[in-house]
Amino acid sequence: MQLNELNCVILCGGKSSRMGQDKSKLILKNQNLTQFQVNKFSKIFKNVYVSAKEDKFENHFNLIKDSLEFEVYSPMLALYSILSNFKNEFVFVLSVDSPKVGENELLKMLPFLEQNYKIIIAKTPLHKHPLCGFYHSSLAQTCKNFLEKNEQKIGFLFSEIKTKFVEFENEDAFLNLNFYEEYEKFKSELK
């Protein structure tokens, strides 16, 4: 299996409360962070989609909107909505605020898609990264079951589903732009 046979979905629906503004629209090199991620991953994957609660991008991207079945704002709802759009395949899911994840990290996770796992996510010494990994579309119903029990964290899946945590030593590749200072620092590194 090759990366260019797979689909990628960039999650853009977070509240961005720590950042104080919508992270998906932060500007990097004359484009917003969403466009930055879509451009990068379009060179790697078959198709790149954007997941959000509503179309805040004026039809600029292939959009997967959150399901209206549940009136919550959560990663589990986003994952359920994403996986419901695909049939019998793995989908790479990444949050928009992880701009340093690239092909090297993907290639390290890729071989585990051929094994007996339904979830393959990145893990560093300090964190598991549930919003950086491959999820099998067959998990949509499991996500729905958790939503019906009002369990919103993707981490609940790991205890029920065969999950591979792919170990990475370098925390830097998994930087999350949670605060404005982190965004400013990353922006200055791009120059």
UniProtKB/Swiss-Prot annotation:
Gene Ontology cellular-component terms listed: cytoplasm
SUPFAM superfamilies found in the cross-reference section: Nucleotide-diphospho-sugar transferases
Record field: catalytic activity: Mo-molybdopterin + GTP + H(+) = Mo-molybdopterin guanine dinucleotide + diphosphate
Pfam families tied to this protein: NTP_transf_3 (PF12804)
Cofactor: Mg(2+)
Enzyme Commission number, as recorded: 2.7.7.77
Keyword terms, alphabetized: Cytoplasm, GTP-binding, Magnesium, Metal-binding, Molybdenum cofactor biosynthesis, Nucleotide-binding, Transferase
Name of the protein: Molybdenum cofactor guanylyltransferase
Gene coding for it: mobA
